Design a protein with these regions (language model features):
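Toprim catalytic domain recognition across nucleic-acid enzymes
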Residues: 1-356
Length: 356
């Protein structure tokens, strides 16, 4: 059974049904299905954890307290067969409240203003700068305000008032939890949450790999933890050092903290053996298995690599007391980005033309 409270409860029910004595009944659990880990688990059995069993029973009671009261109401108001639960009912309310806030929001008008600037010195190139304001950042709320600024600066000579150069650091994303895996698989692979979990289950339970037999390729995929075992972290760091060199190998291992309230019962989702590279076993996987395994493998490896470095330049140009700003960043050192770049629902920054 799964290494969680539901799996613990199933084990307890089996023990009770079979009439097995507590003192001679043991449970073996593991988070990855590999020969080494399974043998270690068999060598270290434990008794059934009644705290986990009680937690499952409490969850079951709460499901019924909520579901038995709300489900009949749904049948009356909407249609029969609908169900309600302790999680989905609250989540539905939060979604509805948010939708009400969106509908009641009074939209405000915002304008942006860009200036295409070119240095007087020829053959240097053009770049785009965004309107900033005068002494402090100013928002433009109407076409009239935009036209007023344009009438003032159009055709005027801009003077560079400030240039700032700095090195920026970008750190890798943490390893996957269940929710972040579903989000990233949707963004990058176009897979639904349900399909993501189905394919992850296949990778966890095991795939026939040429020369290896049936191998569980990833750890347990239902987790809210960012924790990694010391053994897995050491294996990743050793792989990074051998494959990419010292520059990509940070001085010490990265440790990620779980969010407040996380159960932290299992490790983060990671490959069970980092040396099984996606492209080397691609022929043994389906297209979906390969894509999802590569996503998990890359994210795990990247989370233990050096930070990426950028050279950032911000230029401020002024005309008639109005300031415009342009920012551009060049990748100086790829770091973890040599392996993996986290997806975004929306671009964090607008693409800027290179600065001369």
């Amino acid at each position: 059974t799964d290494p969680d409270r539901e799996g613990e409860a199933i084990s307890w029910h089996l023990k009770e049904l079979l009439g097995l004595p507590d003192e001679s009944t043991y449970r073996v659990t593991f988070n990855e299905i590999t020969k080494k880990v399974v043998n270690e688990a068999i060598a270290s059995p434990r008794q059934i954890d009644m705290d986990l069993v009680d937690a499952q029973q409490a969850r079951r009671v709460l499901d019924r307290v909520v579901g038995y009261q709300i489900s009949p109401y749904l049948w009356k108001k909407i249609r029969r067969g609908l169900s309600a639960g302790r999680v989905q009912s609250v989540a539905t309310r939060l979604v509805c409240e948010r939708e009400e806030e969106i509908r009641s929001f009074e939209a405000q008008e915002y304008w942006s203003l860009d200036a295409l600037l070119e240095r007087i010195k020829p053959n240097v190139g053009k770049f785009t700068a965004q309107f900033y304001g005068k002494e402090k950042k100013q928002e433009l709320h109407s076409e009239a305000e935009v036209n007023a600024v344009m009438d003032t600066v159009k055709g005027a000579e801009f003077t560079v008032s400030d240039v700032k150069r700095q090195e920026k650091t970008r750190n890798p994303a943490p390893p996957f939890t269940t929710s972040t895996l579903q989000q990233e698989a949707s963004r990058k692979l176009g897979m639904s949450p349900r399909r993501t979990m189905a394919v992850a289950q296949q990778l966890y339970e095991g795939v026939d790999i040429t020369g290896e037999g049936t191998v569980g390729l990833i750890t347990y995929m239902r987790t809210d933890s960012l924790r990694l075992s010391e053994e897995a972290t050491a294996a990743a760091r050793s792989f990074i050092l051998g494959r990419y060199g010292k520059e990509y190998y940070p001085g010490k291992a990265r440790v990620y903290k779980a969010r407040e309230g996380a159960q932290d019962a299992h490790e983060a989702i990671r490959p069970s053996n980092v040396t099984l590279e996606p492209d080397e076993i691609k022929k043994d996987l389906t297209a979906e298995q390969y894509r999802l395994y590569k996503l998990i493998w890359s994210r795990f490896l990247a989370c233990q690599m050096s930070s990426a470095l950028f050279d950032s330049v911000t230029i401020e140009a002024a005309a008639a007391d109005y300031r415009f700003r342009a920012t551009h960043s060049d990748l100086k050192f790829s770091g973890y980005m040599a392996v993996y770049v986290e997806g975004k629902d929306e671009d964090e920054e607008e693409l800027q033309s290179p600065l001369p």
